């Protein structure tokens, strides 16, 4: 009989070509990764965090080796045992027996198959497992929380640090045993240990014993998994969205079921081991059937019966204890316990005149007019200087001392904007060696603008009043002065595709970088990676696929390449364990321009705490407008434990510990020692610019919307819940963002910088609460929640917006403005005022319908409701608008300053108070003038439709006269 043929062998030439192809493919696959690792290694050395890079790399590598070796070794051992126990003689069933052919092939390349398969499986397993380096390091460096869960009385640290590691180990043991079972089974089959004949198969003793041991081990691991499943119940999602954590069914049905299934799994494993001696596989088969049946009946059907027939008919009573646990745990996990939150009953109706309340006078004086989400085009038009400079799409709000008083400012760094380069500016030399940095820090006091004219169509006022610190300008306010205003790192700079610049002196050549029209500059900072040697130049040329880096004469022995210029990216690289806030903002700290970034530590599986996701909680109208990408990161514990700074000139990254109690941060400080500086090293000037982060606040306000409720029954019905109001200034239903405001402290009347948000009733529009959090050093992170009565009739943001825009004065003038302008409603601020009342303030911006136009403040709208109804103020200034509600109260507001020269945009050196306005026109005069405007517009439309040019011209003249008459009325 002719023996089965093996696989055909390759010729020598074919083998050489195959080897070359494999090497080339490996280089293409691995080469860019190696280059990236090398340039990253250089970068981490530049910023002083190379220990982070090596620690992460080493942890990944060790994890890759350990898991790869363990999984590969178990598979190899299973194959080896099966091969060594093969029958001595294996009869061939016929000339076409396929197994015989495979057996011959394997025997001819025994070492190849015996090594390649386990090695390949091990490598693949290691590559997958190394991504879990965080789990390993947190297990090795975990810290106690000092809080225990209410069910097992275990420290929360067990659930956040230990349990994920045990699950990780258990999962890979499952994978290893399952792969070993398959490998052992296939090997026995190929070498005759298992024969399939007719409807039944036969096993050799060795095959039966080995497979029974492996299967028994697998079931034994399942028993261990059932034990750990009990702890995983502490983050059960069965009762979501009502609450997170185990409810009545989980505790009284699922938890006992896990112990029952554990016992059955142990019995099943023993049955497999017993089959080694009984030589009867029917017993373990019956045990497996029992385990499967029990999993269905005990693990699923019984809990379902309890849930449907015992819990649901009495849910409020049955779940009461577990809702209490959820409330307490969620408050702890999100930092909204009674230690941090002060609840204050607030009537919602004013009881005094604002001018009689010192704190209200401070609030009115600091009412913010400038909206940082609208004014970027205005900053660009008036303070850009050069086409290659730019400002971010959304500006920032911060506070500084001005004339001894705390004031809030809209601030921005004037950054390099590589995407704005045009013409020859985009040449590689110019783009990467000439236009390398931004110039200046620009601030505008948020409660001041140049004088707005009574004529809303006039475009000479309503602009920010700037304080600029750059290479040619020094601000009067020393707190805004930057010693070195050049910025090599920033949000705008990093938005270009290849965000790198090459700096440093070249022997024999003068400065190359653009500084001003009359001077050039050579970078002298510590930032940047040296590319003075050819090896580094080659690495970066390959990284950016740019040959000019190799051959350009603009690069010398002292040259450095600056890359990774986004402040947030730099922080995320040196602290990969942090989740960063969406807003990085510039601040002048000790004479330097610093980017400040908030960092969050998070954890999953906090027992009974509500599970959340950033993308589900923090997105608001601003995020929708800017298209910001929010990470889909789930967590049930969060702390703002780290404040990071990035120097705008040299890129130095510094991490500061601001929460000394956070066990997650302590764990990471154990993983990466000496990377986070203690709180004591934060300077007073830096502390003065710390803001409570917006993303953290948005997460906490969502939690407070539910978890301010103490009573489980009330919690279950949702009756007392709040909601984040939708932003009334846009057309979508996106959440209203929180706003930074300066308000008067109720005790001292001093200006207090706070982050605020109104809250409306659940599925209602009336105001239910007002949440604010302090930003000053003494009270940082302390919440104040003003709770309105449940029967309140205080208008919410949507209602206030509707009331203001439907006012006859507002509606008529806005309709007129829209004829030739784009109208934008600015941030609708909610301000507690008048000892119990709520004042809404909203700037109205206009922008002409022309290519180079930009927004300017046109009007200010205010709204206040009390027992006498809703009162609306509408005027060019805050002072006038508030005085329309409370005569004389607006005198506390900051007066506007004269408009700048329209040609230069420069502000006057000495602010002056505008002359007193003429007495306002009577309402009858205004009504008549508006009626004439409307009538003239109707006549114009009729003449246009008729096609009569004579009538059209007359109607146009009539409309112009009507508009002039309306605008001439004193306001």
Curated annotation (Swiss-Prot):
Annotated localization: Cell membrane
Pfam families named in the record: UPF0182
Cleaved signal peptide residues: none
Topology term for the membrane: Multi-pass membrane protein
Transmembrane segments: 16-36, 61-81, 112-132, 172-192, 209-229, 257-277, 286-306
Region of interest called Disordered, as start-end residue ranges on this chain: 890-927
Assigned keywords, A-Z: Cell membrane, Membrane, Transmembrane, Transmembrane helix
A cellular component term, taken from the record's GO annotations: extracellular region
NCBIfam families to which the protein is assigned, alphabetical: PRK00068.1 (NF000825), PRK12438.1 (NF009097)
PANTHER family: UPF0182 PROTEIN SLL1060
Similarity comment: Belongs to the UPF0182 family.
Protein name: UPF0182 protein RER_22310
Organism: Rhodococcus erythropolis (strain PR4 / NBRC 100887)
Phylogenetic lineage: Bacteria, Bacillati, Actinomycetota, Actinomycetes, Mycobacteriales
């Amino acid at each position: 009989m002719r023996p089965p043929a093996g696989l055909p062998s390759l010729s020598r030439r074919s083998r050489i070509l195959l080897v070359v192809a494999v090497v080339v493919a490996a280089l293409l696959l691995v080469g860019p990764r190696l280059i990236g690792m090398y340039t990253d290694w250089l970068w981490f050395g530049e910023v002083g965090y190379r220990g982070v890079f090596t620690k992460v790399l080493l942890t990944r590598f060790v994890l890759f080796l350990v898991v790869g070796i363990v999984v590969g070794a178990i598979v190899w051992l299973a194959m080896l045992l099966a091969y060594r126990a093969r029958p001595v003689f294996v009869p061939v069933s016929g000339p076409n027996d396929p197994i015989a052919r495979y057996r011959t092939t394997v025997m001819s390349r025994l070492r190849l198959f015996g090594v390649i398969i386990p090695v390949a499986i091990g490598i693949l397993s290691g590559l997958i497992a190394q991504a879990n380096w965080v789990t390993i390091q947190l297990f090795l460096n975990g810290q106690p929380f000092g809080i225990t869960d209410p069910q097992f009385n275990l420290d929360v640290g067990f659930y956040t640090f230990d349990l994920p590691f045990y699950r990780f180990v258990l999962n890979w043991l499952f994978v290893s045993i399952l792969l070993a079972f398959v490998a052992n089974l296939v090997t026995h089959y190929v070498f005759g240990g298992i024969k399939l004949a007719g409807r039944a198969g036969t096993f050799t003793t060795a095959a039966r014993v080995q497979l029974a041991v492996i299967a028994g081990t697998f079931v034994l691991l399942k028993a261990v998994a059932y034990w750990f499943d009990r702890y995983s119940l502490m983050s059960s999602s069965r009762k979501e969205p009502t609450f997170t954590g185990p409810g009545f069914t989980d505790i009284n049905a699922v938890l006992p079921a896990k112990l029952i299934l554990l016992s059955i799994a142990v019995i099943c494993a023993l049955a497999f081991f017993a089959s080694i001696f009984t030589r009867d596989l029917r017993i373990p088969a019956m045990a497996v059937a029992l385990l499967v049946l029990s999993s269905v009946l005990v693990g699923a059907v019984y809990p379902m019966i309890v849930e449907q027939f015992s819990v649901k008919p009495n849910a409020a009573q049955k779940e009461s204890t577990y809702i209490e646990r959820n409330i307490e745990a969620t408050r702890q996990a999100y930092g909204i316990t009674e230690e941090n939150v002060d609840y204050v009953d607030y009537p919602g109706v004013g009881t005094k005149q604002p001018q009689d309340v010192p704190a209200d006078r401070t609030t009115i004086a600091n009412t913010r007019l400038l909206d940082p989400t609208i004014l970027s085009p205005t900053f660009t038009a008036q303070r850009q200087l050069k086409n290659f400079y730019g400002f971010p799409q959304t500006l920032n709000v911060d506070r500084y001392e001005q004339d001894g008083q705390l004031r809030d400012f809209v601030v921005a760094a004037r950054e390099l904007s590589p995407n704005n380069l045009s013409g020859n500016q985009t040449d590689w030399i110019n783009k990467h060696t000439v236009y390398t940095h931004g110039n200046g820090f620009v601030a505008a006091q948020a409660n001041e603008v140049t004088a707005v004219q009574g004529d809303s169509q006039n475009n000479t006022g309503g602009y920010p009043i700037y304080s600029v610190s750059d290479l040619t300008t020094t601000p009067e306010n020393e707190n805004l002065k930057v010693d070195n205003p050049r910025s090599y790192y920033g949000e705008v700079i990093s938005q270009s595709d290849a965000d790198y610049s090459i700096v440093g002196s070249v022997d024999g050549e003068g400065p190359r970088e653009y500084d001003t029209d009359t001077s050039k500059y050579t970078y002298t900072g510590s930032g940047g990676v040296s590319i003075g040697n050819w090896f580094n130049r080659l690495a970066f040329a390959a990284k950016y696929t740019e040959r000019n880096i190799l051959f350009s004469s603009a690069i010398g022995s002292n040259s450095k390449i600056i890359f990774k210029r986004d402040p947030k990216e730099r922080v995320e690289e040196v602290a990969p364990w942090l989740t960063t806030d969406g807003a990085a903002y510039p601040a002048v700290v000790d004479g330097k321009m610093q980017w400040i970034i908030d960092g969050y530590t998070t954890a999953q599986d906090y027992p009974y705490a509500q599970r959340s996701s950033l993308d589900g909680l923090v997105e608001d109208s601003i995020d929708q407008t800017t298209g910001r990408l929010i990470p889909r990161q789930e967590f049930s514990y969060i702390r703002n434990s780290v404040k990071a700074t990035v120097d705008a000139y040299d890129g130095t990254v510094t991490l500061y510990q601001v929460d000394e109690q956070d066990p997650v941060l302590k764990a990471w400080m154990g993983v990466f020692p000496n990377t986070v500086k203690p709180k004591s090293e934060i300077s007073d000037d830096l502390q003065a610019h710390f803001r409570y982060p917006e993303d953290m606040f948005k997460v906490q306000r969502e939690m407070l919307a539910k978890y301010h409720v103490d009573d489980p029954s009330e919690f279950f019905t949702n009756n007392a819940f709040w909601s984040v109001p939708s932003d009334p200034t846009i057309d979508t239903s996106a959440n209203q963002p929180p706003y930074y405001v300066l308000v008067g402290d109720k005790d001292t009347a001093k200006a207090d910088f706070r982050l605020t948000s109104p809250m409306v009733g659940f599925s209602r529009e009336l105001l239910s609460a007002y949440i604010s959090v302090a930003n000053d050093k003494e009270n940082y992170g302390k919440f104040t929640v003003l709770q309105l009565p449940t029967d309140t009739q205080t208008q919410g943001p949507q209602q206030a917006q509707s009331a203001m825009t439907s006012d006859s004065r507002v509606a008529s003038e806005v309709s007129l403005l829209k004829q030739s302008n784009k109208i934008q409603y600015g941030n609708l601020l909610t301000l507690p005022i008048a000892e119990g009342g709520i004042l809404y303030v909203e700037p109205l911006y206009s922008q002409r319908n022309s290519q180079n136009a930009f927004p300017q403040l046109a009007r200010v709208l205010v709204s206040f409701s009390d027992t006498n109804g809703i009162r609306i103020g509408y005027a060019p200034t805050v002072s006038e608008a508030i005085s329309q509600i409370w005569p004389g109260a607006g005198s506390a507001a900051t007066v506007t300053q004269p408009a700048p020269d329209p040609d230069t945009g420069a502000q006057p050196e000495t602010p002056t108070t505008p002359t007193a306005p003429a007495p306002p026109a009577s309402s009858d005069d205004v009504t008549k003038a508006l009626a004439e405007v409307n009538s003239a517009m109707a006549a114009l439309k009729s003449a246009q439709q008729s096609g009569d040019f004579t009538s059209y011209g007359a109607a146009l003249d009539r409309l112009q006269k009507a508009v002039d008459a309306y605008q001439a009325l004193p306001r």
